[in-house]
C-alpha cells in the first residue's frame, strides 16, 4: 500500500534537503515478561529537524531467538516458555533499535555454589533474577577431563587422571589449569584455532611452493600463543606486517586474504565482531554501518603494495607512498580512512595507514576489539558466545548477559590483553566447573550457563583422543611420526576422519566453518570403518599390550581403560560386566583375550561419554 501511494502521488524522490531520521526509539525498551506473555511495542522516529513520528505500523521487526519469542508485523511480542533474554530488532529506514524481554522461570534459588570470581558474580546474579537454580559443581573426574580437552585438545593420561583424583590439595584444580596453560599442548590447541581463523592454508595449485610460508606462519602463531604475547601486539603484528614470509611470517595473512574487500571484512569480523559485508553495497539492514563506513574502513588498506619476493612463491608486502583514500561506489567521493564509528583521519602520504588502524583497534577505549576476543573465547569454553553467533556483535544482537561481557572485557583490558589470564579466569570459575547434569529446572536452559552444555569433541581432539585410547598413531604425510592432529600446520593434510568430523577448511574468518553436529557418516565411521578397526587392533596398540601383560590383574587393566577414556575408574557394575565378558571369551580360546579387549575398546570409544566433552 505504501508503494502504491508513492507511485500514484507521482513517484517523487523527495527533497534531498528534507529532514532525515536521526534515531529510532522503542517503548518500552526492556521488560520482565512471563511465559506466554504479550507486549505491544511503540516505535517513535526522531528526525533531524526535531520532529517525531509514530512509525509502529511501518517499522520492521525480528526476534533474535524465535524459539523464545515471536513478533507480529505491527510489533506485538509474544513470549514462549523458555527462560532467558530475547531481543526484538526494530528497523525503520536506516536506523535500528532493540527491545529486550527477560523471561524468568521463577523457581527458588536458595543455595548457590561457591562464587570464585567475577564470572560467577554476574552469572549467579542473572540466575537469581531468572529464578533458575544452577546444577551442582562437577566431580574431579569430569573437571580434569573437561579442562584438558578444552586447553590441550587431548585426554588426560590414566596416570594423570589417577594422580589428580588421589590429590587432596584443595587448590588442585587451579594448579592443573596452570600446568596445562604452561604446556606445549595449550600452544598447539590455540595455534590450530587461530591458524584456521587467519586462513593460513597452502595454495591448492602450488602446494609445495606455498608450504614453507604456511608452516612459518603457523609457527609464528604458535610462538605467540606459547609466549603469551599480549593480544593487542599479536593483532598489530598481523595487520602491520611488511616484508617477506622468510623474514616476517605474519605477512602470509596477506597472501591468504588477497583482495582488499576480504581484508576489510575479515578484520572487522575476526577482530571486531562486526559483519560489515552488507555495507559494501547498501546500508546494513540490522546495523548502523553504511556504505560510507565500509569505504572509510577500506581506505586503511588502500596503500598496501605487493611485489615479487626473493623466493619463487613469496611476495614482499610494503607500504606504497601516497594519500590513503577509497572511492564511494555511488558518489565516487574520495573518503579518508576511519575506524568504525570514528572520525576520518588525515594520514600523511609517507605514513602506513595500517599502523593507524592497529592503534585505533587496540586502544583501550575501543568498543569492539577486546569485547570480540572475550566473546570468542567464551564460546570456545561454553559452546556459544555471550553474543551468538560469536562474531555477529551488532547492536541488534544483544548479549545474554551484558554485565558479564562488559566486566570480563574490562578485566581483559586491565590485564594488558593477557590471553592466558582470560582463559584462567574462565576455567577457574564455578560457572565453567558446573555439572552438565540438569536439575529439575534447568533442562531447557541454553543461554544462561546454569549448567555445562555438553558438546562433541572437535575433530582434531577426537582423532588424538582415539589414538591415546587405542595406543595407535595416525600418520600424516610429510610430518614426523607422532605428530598429533591438532599440531598440523594447516587443513591441507588429507584425512577422511578430520573431514567427516568437521575440521574447518581455513577458507573463512568465521568459526562456523568448524562442524560440531553429529551425522550418519560419523556414526558409521566409528562403528565399522577400516581405520577404526586398524587402530583398535594395532600390533603395538593398547589391546595387544594389555593382552600380553601377564603380570597385571584384569581388573587393573580395565581400570586403565576407563581412566584413559573417561578419567574415572569403572563402577562396580561396569567392572563386573567387563570381567565376565573377557572370561567368557577366554574360556573358549585363551588367545581370545586380545579380541575381547578390542571389543571393549570399540564399545568405549563409541559411547557418548567418550565422544563428548561434558
What name fits each language-model region?
Residues 1-124, 129:
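Extracytoplasmic soluble-region selector
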Residues 2-13, 521-528, 532, 536-537:
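Catalytic cores of secreted or luminal carbohydrate-active enzymes
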Residues 113-185, 196-477, 512-513, 533-597, ...:
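Primarily short, surface-exposed interaction patches in extracytoplasmic proteins
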Residues 188:
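Metal- or metallocofactor-binding catalytic centers and their adjacent structured scaffolds
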Residues 191-192:
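Amphipathic alpha-helical scaffolding segments comprising HEAT/armadillo-like alpha-solenoid repeats
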Residues 470-479, 486-487, 497-503, 508-527:
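Long, His/Glu/Asp-enriched segments that create or flank divalent metal/ion-associated functional microenvironments
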Residues 600:
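Globin-like tetrapyrrole-binding proteins
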